[in-house]
Amino acid sequence: MYKKTTLGLIICLLSCSLWAKGKAGIDLTLIPPATITNQVDLDIRVGITNYDISVRSLDVSLYLNKIDRNTLLYHSTCQVEKDNPLTIRYNMQTRDKVGKNKIILVVKDGTKKTIQTRDIEIIDSNIRSTRLIDGAWTSIYHWSETEGKHWNNDLRRMTDDQWREMIRSMHKVGMDIIVIQEVFRNEQYVGKHDITVETYQGKAFYPSDLYEGRMEIAAKDPVEAILAEADKHGMHVMMGVGMFAWFDFTPESLEWHKRVAKELWDKYGHHPSFYGFYVSEESGGGLDNWEKTPEKRQIRKNDIVNFFAEFKKFCNRMAPAKPIMLATNSMDVPNGKETYPELLKNLDILCPFGFARMPENDLTGKQAATMLQKLCNDAGSHLWFDLEAFLFNEDQSLYPRPIEQIIHDLNLFDNFEKILCYQFPGVFNDPKMSIRVGEKRTVDLFEGYQKYRERILYNRKAGIKNEIVSTKTVQGTWLNLPYQDVRNKYMNPFHVDCTAPAFWKQKIKEYSDIGLEYLVIMAVANERQAYYPSSFMKYAYPSNRQSPVEAIMEAADQYGMKVFMSCGWAVNQDDNIREPAIKELQQKIMKETADLFKEHINPEKPDVPLNKNDAFQKVQKRHVQEKR
């Protein structure tokens, strides 16, 4: 059950401003920004800091679309002390507010009046998701040389102007929330280092005054370039406060994050596009860093709760309306279920990833999303989706995910109020940019997503709600093992050994890569010769190697695909199953293949043979990696 309209006034015991260093002491923030559906309430936040006198008496009002008594959402008279900023939080229901709207903040300070506005478009829908990618992560240089193999060299040579180009390209496809992955590079892990704030050796992506180390990149200040260009297009930038060390929420990490967050706010807080703070360290869904002992696991859980309680308090001293976001993976969430309520008290946005690659013996991606949604609802926090727009090559380098798979996830996970993707550089490429970051297929993904988005926007304008927009992609294919007649001339040519296990393992990988999920084996036998290790038929393949059917089943397990097993041919493709002898032989093949390949059936939910088309389906869970 989602939160009803509530009004809260939170006075934060902090230290901050009405004007100082070029930053206004009044800030209006919408969570989520820009576009939402009318199934999502709008979290309106006002932050006020008094930089001048001891106490300031203010009259604060919020209006919808115009300043009028009938459009008043909220009003109060507030006393704002110096060193004691004020946060006002108003939750607005949106069901009856479809269309383009404007939230108007009016703050009166005696005779002085300050007005700020924020646009919000509310889409008529019966689901929470907009089914579009509303933003993306941006690594100025990817943290892993292995994963970033195909694009890190390109990122290294990008200039400030080319970073501005990239921001324009993101805006072109509506990815208007930019999450800077990190502003320092330091490849360390919690529990594996003895770094302190003073001994930190990380390298900055911007001209930091805190530490001397600099990343060796062509751009002089890509952070400034990103923010300045985002200002021009009304975009929103989550500033990546990191990296101290992966998964590290210890007190030393907290102190480092405070110092870096303050420097980032001092240097860049005047930018209208500076939307909030993103803590780069990430966490497992269980919140315990996969520690081996109960004591260690509890320490990690306590660390992350204490970190965000203190970091939130610190950031509110500088910027009381700015949200804080963390990305966790979606795995092992039940293990952290008792810790999430305390964590989410001080975490505005949880943005988990990995739903498409859940491990065995865990929740499904959909179940994990539902559990996290309830936890966030109960805490009054926001749940966004970090959609992975990449896949792993065998060498663990990343490459663009097929657009069909991305569209599938955009339509499957419909509870998220905002969908961001990881990541834009090296995965998407605008063909009009002066530099291509990564492989040629990054351009294909950009153009494929652009077409999908245009269709969604067209449907919105036409009043079509929640049509599943895709090209009605092929979800499966038949597999022919024998060469039977001239029709197989091009599919199973004589010069190709279609019984070789390596051949089929490669083919199944290719089918998985292009988004196929179902495999239908046309025939497992022909002319009384079997393509599997039969006990009553001769082998149609060399007996000293794995059968093609075994190779197909193993590869299907590896890539999480589903196989419909054939029960023929008893003799050949002209089998007449009305003849008792043919029917008996096909049933014998069915029983034998069921016995041979039963280990490929999901042990939790064994599937029974399907009568349709004399085939049966083998279903198994996906085998996936646990890291991003």
Predicted regions: what is each one?
Residues 156-187, 348-350, 419, 499-527:
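Catalytic domains of carbohydrate-active enzymes, especially glycoside hydrolases
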